[in-house]
Amino acid sequence: MAIRTARTAWSGDLSEGTGDVELVSSGLGTFHVSFPKRAADDADSTTSPEELIGAALSSCYSMELSGLIGKAGGTPGTLEVQADVAFGPDPAGGFHIPGIELTVRGDPEGLDAEEFARLAEEAKTSCPVSKALTGVSITLEASLD
């Protein structure tokens, strides 16, 4: 079983503190985080847990859909996947992720729009990151290029 590691060093309180998220397994870098920028409309060169969740979901989903297209006898071609992860106040208190909008556009060969949409929906529930996010509503828009 593969294990991937990320580590965060945080300093200060929630409203004024800052942190750095390090992608340990890949060594691809360290990224700055802060709560005020996390909650703002403009990220201002700062990442957030929500952006990282979006990256995890969009990459996992594209791999899963590519595999399903191949199993169905198609050729994946290019898939462009975007995950928009919402973050805001929770009516019950604190903050939450109320939902994720997943958009996929592709140009697979050997599939019609109906089959592509069916496989896109299947990938939404079968990719490992989607499974980990079962407590969050994920909507999907799938279209052919």
Predicted segments, located by residue:
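Extended beta-strand/beta-hairpin segments
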Residues: 1-55, 59-145
